[in-house]
Design a protein with these regions (language model features):
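Short acidic, glycine/proline-enriched helix-loop-strand junctions
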Residues: 113-114, 165-169
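Glycine-rich phosphate-binding active-site loops on the catalytic face of alpha/beta enzymes
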Residues: 95-105, 136-150, 175-198
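Nucleic acid-binding interface residues in structured DNA/RNA-binding domains
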Residues: 155, 174-175
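Catalytic beta/alpha-barrel core
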Residues: 12-13, 31-41, 45-128, 138-140
Length: 198
């Protein structure tokens, strides 16, 4: 017997049937959300960056200047990803879906070989994300946030009830700090995501 780190698991030769479980274990536990692409070079080993920006030619040029070796820790929305060149698309393996984008998709629509992270705000979206093959979901808002003060928070009890009904990793998003990770995991979160303090 020997214990392996999550990073080492990807280098081992597992049967094909085990690949889904291995992929689930390779998600980081913290997702930073920002418009600042420079954060990418300062991420912790157990962190990814969701670059939440609108699709513009300037953003595509900015991404083209980013070192290719850093792109594997980057998450971009499906709309932006579809406008990238082939090398960028092959390197950025995690694609974000807004809930509106998610609900327009059906089983078989997702590109194979990529990880999809779905933004969900209710149970029906969460279940749909799992059914069409998304590998993880952001469920929000867990707590009240400064960025969306008028959006009612789910609260931890409702978050847990929803997260328990799917088998994909669910990240808690909304009003959280890095120190909330351990509590979030006790509430059936795989990890946490956030703009300011994650």
């Amino acid at each position: 017997w020997r214990w392996y780190s999550r990073e080492e698991l990807g280098q081992l030769n597992f049967p094909k049937a085990n690949q889904f479980m291995i992929q689930k274990l390779q998600w980081p536990q913290r997702i930073k959300i920002s418009e600042d692409l420079n954060i990418l070079s300062n991420l912790d080993t157990d962190q990814m960056l969701y670059w939440r920006v609108d699709l513009t030619s300037e953003r595509i040029m900015q991404l083209a200047q980013c070192p290719v070796d850093q792109l594997s820790k980057l998450i971009v929305n499906q709309q932006l990803w579809s406008h990238l060149n082939e090398l960028q698309q092959q390197t950025i393996r995690t694609i974000h879906l807004k809930q509106t984008q998610l609900m327009e998709l059906k089983q078989g629509d997702l590109k194979s070989g990529y990880r999809y992270l779905a933004a969900c705000h209710d149970l029906s979206a969460l279940i749909h994300a799992e059914q069409i093959g998304c590998e993880a979901a952001l469920l929000s808002p867990v707590l009240a946030t400064e960025t969306h003060p008028d959006t009612p928070a789910l609260g931890w009890e409702r978050f847990k009830q929803m997260a328990e009904q799917v088998q994909i990793p669910v990240f808690a998003l909304g009003g959280l700090r890095a120190e909330d990770l351990h509590y979030a995991k006790r509430q059936h979160a795989y990890g946490i995501a956030g703009i300011r303090y994650v």
